[in-house]
């Protein structure tokens, strides 16, 4: 299992979350097996999320997809995301 973390700012959390939730079917279709979203304790526009994948290749393909980039832009992501991949220790 690969867990991908992503952190990025958003213009408006409620707008972003609605778009994120609407992208569920697409996420599953691109190999996401589980996910969760968090807001920074001192800045609700600072979002961190994790997504689980079966393989690193699936996670990397998800990150590189035009579909994801378009969805993030439409959802109001205002900065370049920081992304990292982990495996269970």
What is the role of each PLM region?
Residues 1-70, 74-89:
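Short S/T/G/P-rich N-terminal loop/turn motif that feeds into the first structured element of a domain
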